[in-house]
Amino acid sequence: MTAQLIDGKAIAASLRQQIAKRVAERRQQGLRTPGLAVILVGSDPASQVYVSHKRKDCEEVGFLSQAYDLPANTTQEDLAGLIDRLNDDPNIDGVLLQLPLPEHLDASLLLERIRPDKDVDGFHPYNVGRLAQRIPLLRPCTPKGIMTLLESTGADLYGMDAVVVGASNIVGRPMAMELLLAGCTVTVTHRFTKDLAGHVGRADLVVVAAGKPGLVKGEWIKEGAIVIDVGINRQDDGKLVGDVVYETALPRAGWITPVPGGVGPMTRACLLENTLYAAESLHS
């Protein structure tokens, strides 16, 4: 058996087309164009690439996009002031603060400064709390995108044993809550977990978001399991690989996401989806 690929690139492209269509309809109706402000502090190369992709996505779907490229020595006070101004700007529906920030800045305080109804990344404690209470509003983009990928397989998630490898605030923890909402029995593993292979081997669905290339071996995967690889790691030879050993997981899994072209495009598409939702449902 060879796993079927979950083509995140194609699914994300379809979602962007739907968003662009809705933006065009809004214009025809005389409604405001959704607006996204993207803040980049410093010159981290990976962050610059991510931000350029997000700005390109905005142009593709017809969003108003405002770019703020700030020097690495920007102060906490100055950055907080910019966020406050964007919070008050009626043309802006979403405020995105690109992470990581320079070490002298307190990311937690700054993320909490973004108004929850403009927190299109879904990182604010208010939005994470709503997800935990089973009344999600703006959902964290990567877990939200993964749920869309899972829906594309047609699999019935109710009662599935799901394992999330990694317990970060951005992916692992909200992912577990999304899977609980979907009816899965969820185990979250982390750096202190004993017998990771045993947990993975019992799972019908594995979501790996640890940021460690090749952490999950293909032979650990249960026959027919769904494997979602969130990791994206650049090797010395420039090749991008995930947290799962793809070549050995492929013959065992039922469905699997490639790296690249799996989860990453969906994260970006869900950022646009959240921004459109904020414009239509929260700021109309």
Curated annotation (Swiss-Prot):
Keyword Amino-acid biosynthesis: yes
GO cellular component assignments: cytosol
Pathway: One-carbon metabolism; tetrahydrofolate interconversion
A GO term, aspect molecular function: methenyltetrahydrofolate cyclohydrolase activity
Source taxon at top rank: Bacteria
Key words of the record: Amino-acid biosynthesis, Histidine biosynthesis, Hydrolase, Methionine biosynthesis, Multifunctional enzyme, NADP, One-carbon metabolism, Oxidoreductase, Purine biosynthesis
EC number: 1.5.1.5, 3.5.4.9
Stored InterPro entries: Aminoacid_DH-like_N_sf, NAD(P)-bd_dom_sf, THF_DH/CycHdrlase, THF_DH/CycHdrlase_cat_dom, THF_DH/CycHdrlase_NAD-bd_dom
Database matches in SUPFAM superfamilies: Aminoacid dehydrogenase-like, N-terminal domain, NAD(P)-binding Rossmann-fold domains
Catalytic activity, reaction form: (6R)-5,10-methylene-5,6,7,8-tetrahydrofolate + NADP(+) = (6R)-5,10-methenyltetrahydrofolate + NADPH; (6R)-5,10-methenyltetrahydrofolate + H2O = (6R)-10-formyltetrahydrofolate + H(+)
Entry-linked Pfam families: THF_DHG_CYH (PF00763), THF_DHG_CYH_C (PF02882)
Positions bound to NADP(+): 166-168, 232
A GO BP entry: L-histidine biosynthetic process
SUBUNIT field: Homodimer.
Family under the similarity heading: Belongs to the tetrahydrofolate dehydrogenase/cyclohydrolase family.
Function: Catalyzes the oxidation of 5,10-methylenetetrahydrofolate to 5,10-methenyltetrahydrofolate and then the hydrolysis of 5,10-methenyltetrahydrofolate to 10-formyltetrahydrofolate.
HAMAP family: THF_DHG_CYH (MF_01576)
Protein name: Bifunctional protein FolD
Organism: Pseudomonas fluorescens (strain ATCC BAA-477 / NRRL B-23932 / Pf-5)
Name of the gene encoding the protein in the UniProt record: folD
